[in-house]
Amino acid sequence: MARLTHFDGDGQAHMVDVSGKAVTDRIAVADCYIKMTTQTLDLVEQGTAKKGDVLGVARLAGIMGAKKCADLIPLCHPLPITKVAVDLVPDASLPGVRITATVKTSGQTGVEMEALTAASTAALTVYDMLKAAEKTMEIGGLRVVLKDGGKSGRFEAPEGSAP
């Protein structure tokens, strides 16, 4: 089993020292979904939700979430993020919205947590904007689907492992 780097020899949590690591280009992609009724999805697609442009606001919230990751997760390093993209795609087969967040940096540590935070923040924002219409929405499937750059190399989630 891999050694957990966020704990010292005494088992105490600490922020990992990355000062000796090389600066490399890094990318992470995370995705999730939010399920809802077809009637609620219609509000999204027709732009008739009471709070406004659900997907546009959720996209911005996801971007903001990535930028605030180090403020939310105690042992994350503040990073010079060079790109955040959040894609929200209505999917009638769920029914709901599929969310993908891509984050890039050129730095000494990866951006997986920023991508996960972006995707989850976008999903939470969709919920917030639609909760007056439906309280039974379900957020799920949050995962890293791609991570590249740095010492550990490339990781891609197996195809077909998403709902």
Swiss-Prot record:
Give the pathway: Cofactor biosynthesis; molybdopterin biosynthesis
Q: EC number(s) per UniProt?
A: 4.6.1.17
Listed binding positions for substrate are L75, C76, H77, M113, E114
Per its UniProt record, what SUPFAM superfamilies does this chain match? Molybdenum cofactor biosynthesis protein C, MoaC
Q: What class of enzyme is it?
A: lyase
Q: Does the keyword RNA-binding apply?
A: no
* Active site as annotated: D128
InterPro entries tied to this protein: MoaC, MoaC_bact/euk, MoaC_sf, MoCo_biosynth_MoaA/MoaC, Mopterin_CF_biosynth-C_dom
Q: Which GO terms describe its biological process?
A: Mo-molybdopterin cofactor biosynthetic process
Signal peptide interval: none
Domain of life of the native organism: Bacteria
Any one GO molecular-function label of the UniProt entry: cyclic pyranopterin monophosphate synthase activity
Name the chemical reaction catalysed here: (8S)-3',8-cyclo-7,8-dihydroguanosine 5'-triphosphate = cyclic pyranopterin phosphate + diphosphate
Which Pfam family name is an example for this entry?
MoaC
NCBIfam families (alphabetical): moaC (TIGR00581), PRK09364.1 (NF006870)
Self-association or partners: how does it assemble?
Homohexamer; trimer of dimers.
Similarity-based family = Belongs to the MoaC family.
The entry's protein name is Cyclic pyranopterin monophosphate synthase
The organism that produces this protein has a lineage beginning with:
Bacteria, Pseudomonadati, Pseudomonadota, Alphaproteobacteria, Rhodobacterales
Query: What is the gene called?
Result: moaC
